[in-house]
Amino acid sequence: MASLIRMPYPLILLLILIMATASHSHPMQGFCSVESDPELTSSSGKILIKHGTVVNAHHKVVADVYIEDGVVVSVRPNIAVGDDVKVIDATGKYVMPGGIDPHTHMEMDFMGTVTIDDFYTGQAAALAGGTTMHIDFVIPINGNLSAGFASYVEKAKKSVMDYGFHMAITKWDEAVSKEMELMVKENGINSFKFFMAYKGSLMINDELLLKGLEKCKSLGALAMVHAENGDAVAEGQRRIIDLGITGPEGHALSRPPVLEGEATARAIRLASFINAPLYVVHVMSIDAMEEIAKARKSGQRVIGEPVVSGLTLDESGLWDSDFTTAAKFVMSPPIRKAGHDKALQNALATGILQLVGTDHCTFNSTQKSFGYGDFRKIPNGVNGIEERMHLIWETMVESEKITVTDYVRITSTECAKIFNIYPKKGAILEGSDADIIVLNPNASFRISATSHHSRSDTNVYEGKTGKGKVEVTISGGRVVWEEGNLKITSGSGKYIKMPPFSYLFDGIDKADANYLASLHSPVHRTAAAF
């Protein structure tokens, strides 16, 4: 980087352009190789996992699990099988539902570039880390939902595991309202995201948010918000730049926790006004968490999703003297000061926050360097889809903050219930999809960009170690991760449609009726003589 600083600025831009072009010309550059087997596109037949502790969200038992044609057939002790069955010995290990990541951005156009992980490399990383399904955010094309959906369907053709879609809403008119109906009724989308940040691009105003909340409620779809005050963030960025602070630390300084807390509170109150369930994505601060806690205590239906970066990191990396190191930590909302992480862990342990995502949105160091000299141009996003299951085990289970059954709930089951795909996903029960992991609580892991499966050349969790390692991943009845080897095939993943009206909508109609009955209006008055 020192040599870059001595170069004339136009040459720096030219060098960056050349590097970026080279990166896009070689789509597999920097990606750990995996074995590809065309026969893996169909279910690999019969599997018996024996002698493990089978863990669901509310129960664990020592039992065998028999899988056939991609489905769990039986869960009980001492299952006898023939020689044509692959047997996995899970003695002393946990057999759990594969992780479900509710928050990812694969191959997303953002801030003048495209996230470096696509539906092949990002999902490969997920499987190596024990996640067997994710839900990605579709970004409309010029506000058009159908065009955005078609684009993501095309991107996802290379999928190697199951996935679903959320849909972002970036503008409002009658056409968008009609398209939301289409997305829910025909395309299997039951959640819509509203950005309260990114002024001038994705950001919506309160009027649009209100209309969106009303529409979501009528469709039985869950409204989601990226909660930061976008107007104040823009002012904060201007203020920090005027102070001469242009490096990655300026990103955190320009969008402090109070702006996340304010937007979270505003979204919660507007959702209360409409009586619609609300899902707050990537809760990164005490300020936002406390607003969610107050709302839930009052009985409001609010879901809080922390992400693994906010639970396990602090903002100190943003002050690193090396630009590449500091820039890799830039995401929004920002990673916060030490103390916020522990508070979020405690909120997750006590049920204030319900499930863990990643906001996996990766850019390589070349892409991050677009913001050298102006933090506002650093593409926002970090990795996490491969690291989530390991880091949450180490941070929450090894520390005895939560139980093993809680771990299954926050990494898999709760997500499946919120998005209405339980018990097909998020459980090991007869008839459930055979998306299963075997985790060895005594094995250790170490995280490094040199060994991960993401295409990114950096890793925000670099050097982190711990106990609790996923040794086997089964996706759709296929063993795709075993003995440190991936065996995947492009196109083997399935799109999972998610029906509307999850449990979060139970009792909504009754609450509305009670509200109307409480108004004692209109009052019938006699005409007065004037």
Where on the chain are the PLM-derived regions?
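Metal-associated gating/positioning segment near the N- to mid-region
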Residues: 85-158
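C-terminal cap of metal-dependent C-N hydrolases
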Residues: 370-374, 380, 430-496
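Histidine/acidic residue-rich metal-binding segments in metalloenzymes
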Residues: 175-356, 361, 372-373
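Divalent metal-coordination and catalytic microenvironments
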Residues: 52, 70, 92, 103, ...
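Histidine-rich, glycine-flanked metal-binding segment
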Residues: 26-49, 53-98
